Amino acid sequence: MFCRLSFLFFSLFFCSISFTHGKVLVDTTASSKMLSEVFVLGNSGIKGNGSLVDFDGVRLLAAKKSELIVLSKMDANLANQSFREVFGRTPGLHVIESDPSGFNTSIAIRGLSTNRSWDFNMRQNGYDITPDPMGYNEAYYTPSFEWVEKIEIVRGAAALQYGPQVGGLINYVLEKPIFEKKFGGEVQQTFGSFGLNSSLIKFRSGMKKLAFVASHQYRGGDGFRPNSDFNSNQSYFRVDWKPMADGIFTFELTKSNAQAQLGGGISEAQFKVDPWVSNRARNYYYSHWLMPVVKFNYSPSILFNSQIQVFAIQSGRSQLGFTKTNDVLDVPNSAGNYANRSLDRDEYTSYGAEFRSGLNAFNEKWQTSVGLRIFRGNMFRQQQGIANNGSTYSENLVDPKFPRSLNFVNQNFSAFIENALSISPKFKLAGGLRYEYILSQGDGFLDNNSKFLSPDRLRSFILWGVGASFKPSSALEIYGNASQSFRPISFSDLLPSSTTDVVDLDLKDARSLNFDLGIRGKKGNFLRYDMSVYFLEFTDRIGNLSMKNSNSQSYLYRTNLGSSSSKGIELYAEMDPISILHGSSRYGQISVFVSVGLNNAVYDNFPLTSGENLAGKKLENAPQQILRSGLTYTYQRLSFTYQTSFTAESFSDAQNTVKPTPTGTIGLIPGYTLDDFSFTYKYRKHWLLKGSVNNVMNVSYFTRRGTGAFPGFGILPGAPRNVSCTLGFTF
């Protein structure tokens, strides 16, 4: 692994000292059109990440660290939701790889939580896709990567315009309809290892004032472990109506249904003998998602743009299974009967509206973005239901009453303003404020007899952010920013673990302060790079303290009591050596990339119930090095990519336990190196052939130790070597 990386670093360095012998091509043609990408690649071999424009009409991203991933330029395995390949050029992004279905996204940066991407503000086409960004920001829905045109990433400084979370924004951008485009579409069929079967069909058409795109994907498989089969159906429909030259109405509807069998976690001993064994045969997960959205975009001139969107989410998830730890076997009793299973069920209903407007005045010297957001989210949670003792998925209960029944509501109003002022043609200052108003409420039953009532928690506060950008040329930028963000109080924070525990009446949202300083740019058509350093301070982290009441009885008191910090380096660079040496080649183009994330994430102060303080301990699931490198070769209609990914070891618990427990729930997560190969071949105008081999060396590895019944206690292994092939036809 390190030899491969060293070779790539040497190649980059060798080419960097040769720049003076090449030509720098700069397009000086002025344009008033707002672009969605910064870099135009031309005919070079570079296929990697770009960054977002400073101002796109309603969003102001000047001086922020941003990335743009264009999936159509990738050879990656999209049908199998290969997060490791799709985010391969994104430095420092940690991917949890234990879900063969690919339904849930579990990614993080800078030592933050990987739990279903909790610390990212997850969106699709600019609107929420999580149940409640304020109280339950878990990504149980992920759009099919075969739908996604590009992925926008804005790190911590996105908080001013998007609110929570600490990690920043991830926005999946799906295909847009095109006006005056004749009827057409595409079909893709994928088969792969472990019974993978994916079918995609898409239609599109456009008239003068009306255009639409509609697609459906079915994906299923047996999974790479026993008892891990899955299936999903996702549908997406969008229609654009242009009743006037300056305005477009948009309606979008997304529907998803997914079911997966959960093979459970395994012990340390089991992993050493057979990494892909299963302990559970009767555990299941099910989710349903429905998201209607209405938008209106108004652009009367290049100076002023506005957008309003009204959105809703009606969704839910259920978990069914045998919930004991993995050292307790799920076997029938002497009478031949299995134990009853437990059923947990959530239903989410949320809706809201956002208004954004942008002003681009004085020949782009003054750019302003303002916005308003209103939101209401409701979660109805039922837990510990006594289900049947069967082996198939069923939500039928032996006792129709759930012992635990809870209802949580969040109401949110926010407003922001952000401005960028060009002091000179090369230097720009940016800054802004965001106001948040949040009301959290909850009630229900902790068990059949214990009433739970959470007091109304009303809070309001202001976040600030500043930044600066210096562009000595159109191909080079030095940028920096400092911004505040927050992780809202979650519904689980408001829920005591027992009837005797107490939650602080003055519990606050956790706060963060993020700093970025970097340099990014390009050299002609043969080099692109983005190098930065960061510091992230995270305060008011929520935890439990052991207390005693007036009767000397012990109880847990949940309050704000801890802080942590992360600092590191993020580097992405990609070059085309053939363009450097020859400008072009009759034998094709080569693109070499390297992505480096170096991260030191530690607790600064965090007292525990035992009296211990976690000061100096490493944060959980926060590897200190994430290194990826790869090579893409393109010749006419053929392209292939080989990628190597190294992830260093990390700890699964805050105490930094090295020696694993027998069940595998706690202990060191060893580092690992994985290789992926993929190719694309386009035949004539209509046919497409893609293939991939993931985990080429068939490495046994894992990225997570489970500490709960779902998806399972113990080690949750990653996928072994797997192969897939896709045939597509466009009409």
Q: What spans do the regions from the language model cover?
A:
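Face-selective signature of the C-terminal outer-membrane beta-barrel domain
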Residues: 245-256, 286-445, 471, 530, ...
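Short acidic/polar hinge/loop motifs at secondary-structure boundaries
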Residues: 127-155, 500
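C-terminal beta-signal and adjacent terminal beta-strands/loops
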Residues: 534, 538-539, 578, 590-592, ...
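Transmembrane beta-barrel wall of Gram-negative outer-membrane proteins
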Residues: 191-220, 225-263, 284-305, 362-363, ...
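Gram-negative outer-membrane beta-barrel transporters
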Residues: 425, 533-537, 555-655, 697, ...
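Structural signature of Gram-negative outer-membrane beta-barrels, strongest in the C-terminal barrel
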Residues: 365-367, 372-377, 404-537, 589, ...
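A beta-strand signature from Gram-negative outer-membrane beta-barrel systems
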Residues: 143-186, 581-584, 730
